[in-house]
A protein has these predicted regions:
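Helix N-cap/beta->alpha junction signal
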Residues: 1, 80-81, 238
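N-terminal accessory regions of nucleic-acid-interacting proteins
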Residues: 1-18, 22
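Gly/Thr-rich phosphate-binding beta-strand-loop-beta motif of the actin/hexokinase/Hsp70
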Residues: 15-30, 37
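Short, glycine/acidic-enriched capping/hinge loops at junctions between secondary-structure elements
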Residues: 29-33, 52-54
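Alpha-helix N-cap/helix-start motif
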Residues: 29-30, 110-114, 267
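Active-site-proximal helix-loop-helix substrate-binding element of RNase H-like nuclease domains
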Residues: 38-159, 166, 185-186, 298
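Accessory DNA-binding and partner-docking regions appended to nucleic-acid-acting proteins
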Residues: 145, 155, 161-387
Length: 387
């Protein structure tokens, strides 16, 4: 069995793939703490070798593994890859390429979207996992044999599941569709998009432009304070208090003290910083309401969006594809808005690649009035020309 990360990397090069899972702790931190990395390798005899790396107690060189993650010739197999990819990219300092996510693949193979690893194993291999250690303090040391057994079992069958799904997708002609979907993981990192954070603040639309400018400055200050102190963002300043501060724009700690939701510890430790952030926000240009995306569609669009959803769900069922893989409600809203306003097609995934082939073209014709939707005699949704 490989012992060093260099030996693990060499075996991955020889076999062309590597399975990986991580255990981490996110509670009480700004960023999750990597506690274990479990690696699965083909053993050359149809079985799997599992190696568990412990970054909290072992000194190991991640560089050889980082090279493997970045090598497009080597397939990296994960399940529900988003968090793992972001964590490995940050801690091992490497992009992650050629990802094959078994959760994504299951959606293309006729199973439900976001299928958990345990039901996926049961459905594909008839294997049942023990989950007694799934909610555990992975940062405690020493780990028990039960915890280590759970960690090993989490990747023991991963490569076999990937092979089964790839065979199914090849038979369905959808393997490249799944690989195309998995390529999106290459751009994932663990950096929070502050534009999104700002846009999702409660009651942000109720603030005046100058108040929104202060709110944006507070968002940026809060993020840096949380990152520097490795604390959850909400423990630095929760959203409701942030909005109230932006609304009142206090110029002193005494004024700040009048706002509900700020305890004495926060005022003592961060009061001056908050007031300084408010002052910087006052100097910023106002942010007009048009700069904040509405969270709800126009009421007049709701039935049209529902019509589009009906078509997408029908085509998803016919194609044995998970609906969530084809369209998101936000995509449908953007398509409906663009058709209504006579704007160019929006760049949404429903109108691109294989999705356009499955339903995107029909969706545009339906929403533009060139096609109609009805229930056929076999109780299936039919789309036909409106002429």
């Amino acid at each position: 069995m490989p012992r060093s990360t260099a030996e693990i990397a060499q075996r991955a090069r020889e076999t062309g793939r590597l399975g990986i899972d991580t255990e981490f702790m996110g509670e009480g931190r700004y960023q999750p703490l990597l506690c274990l990395a479990q690696i699965a390798l083909d053993d050359g005899d149809g079985g799997t070798e599992v190696i568990v790396l412990d970054p909290l107690t072992e000194e190991y060189d991640p560089a050889p593994l980082a090279e493997i993650l970045a090598d497009p010739a080597i397939e990296i197999v994960l399940h529900a890859a988003r968090q793992d990819v972001a964590l490995l990219r940050r801690d091992w300092g490497s992009p992650v390429t050629n990802v094959f996510d078994t959760q994504v693949a299951a959606g293309f193979a006729g199973m439900r979207a976001q299928l958990g690893y345990e039901p996926l194993l049961k459905e594909t291999l008839g294997v049942r996992l023990r989950k007694s250690a799934s909610f555990t303090r992975w940062d405690d040391r020493p780990l028990t044999e039960e915890q280590l057994g759970y960690a090993r079992e989490d990747v023991l069958h991963l490569l076999q599941v990937a092979s089964v799904l790839q065979d199914r997708l090849t038979a369905l002609g959808r393997l490249e569709w799944a690989r195309e979907e998995c390529r999106a993981f290459e751009a994932i990192d663990d950096k929070r998009d502050l534009d999104v954070v700002f846009g999702k603040l409660p009651r942000i639309n109720s603030l005046e432009p100058a108040q929104r400018a202060v709110a944006r400055e507070l968002v940026e200050w809060r993020e840096e304070a949380a990152r520097t102190g490795d604390r959850p963002v909400s423990s630095v300043l929760h959203d409701a208090a942030l909005i109230e501060i932006a609304k009142r724009r206090p110029a002193s700690v005494d004024r700040l003290r009048q706002i509900r939701g700020l305890n004495d510890a926060t005022l003592h430790r961060r009061g001056k910083q908050i007031v300084e952030a408010v002052a910087r926000g006052r100097e910023r240009d106002g942010i007009p309401v048009e700069g904040v995306r509405p969270s709800q569609p126009d009421a007049e669009d709701a039935p049209i969006i529902a019509l589009g959803e009906a078509l997408v769900r029908s085509r998803a069922m016919e194609s044995e594809l998970a609906y969530e893989l084809i369209a998101a409600r936000a995509d449908l809203q953007r398509i409906v808005t663009s058709v209504r306003e006579g704007e160019p097609e929006p760049e949404v995934r429903t109108l691109q690649g294989w999705r356009r082939e499955v339903v995107g073209e029909e969706l545009l014709e339906l929403l533009s009035g060139r096609r109609t939707l009805r229930v056929g005699p076999d109780h299936r949704v039919e789309i036909s020309s409106s002429e």
